[in-house]
């Protein structure tokens, strides 16, 4: 789309917001904002511990008392109690720890899943992040300034470029069955004029800006998790999802 000056822009009721945006900024300029601000987990951290909380996945149910009884939320408006479910809590926690951060020092940053069901309308069930193998996988996430997350959620070209960067950085591409068609399209990507120069186009070619190197503190956090998982497998209550946890560990070849 040809770019228009601010004085020329006429916004009608039927105008698509993304088209209007791309009339002011090029796709390259949009992606440049992400290029210069994103925070990536180091490949060494990913290899050390690919998935941090395999007991959790999007829409999973929360339990208290060491997985022995349901954790409920009570509505102030209706007084009704409902079973509390996972939104993005443990994905956020995994990414925060893998970047050596603390939640309270992460104001206005958002966890963005790289591989998932592409649905700008937010109407489809996201089977990828409902999979225990991929929800808290640190190679499936990037930390972005919160306003920029909307670009990744609503602009397929931006999400594709993130996926190309991630698979070349980590040497891994999500192989969930529901991603077979999107992954095939990714192989045909040819919009390199908008792809950031600082991002890798091939495996191990380069690292994007914003990679947080594996530090002793990050390593220490990663090395705590296998012992916790091992203890939960042995001792957690009846609602602990043992089969799904073991399947995730087997997929990633994690030995406890």
Regions found by a protein language model. Give the residues of each.
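C-terminal, well-folded lobe of enzymatic/effector domains
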Residues: 181-256
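Short, isolated positions within intrinsically disordered regulatory regions of eukaryotic proteins
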Residues: 44, 56, 71, 119, ...
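Histidine-centered catalytic micro-motifs used for acid/base chemistry in nuclease
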Residues: 84-147
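Generic recognition of cysteine residues
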Residues: 111-112, 137, 165, 174, ...
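Generic detector of well-ordered alpha-helical segments enriched in charged/polar residues
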Residues: 19, 31, 35, 92, ...
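Acidic, low-complexity intrinsically disordered regions
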Residues: 36, 48, 63, 105, ...
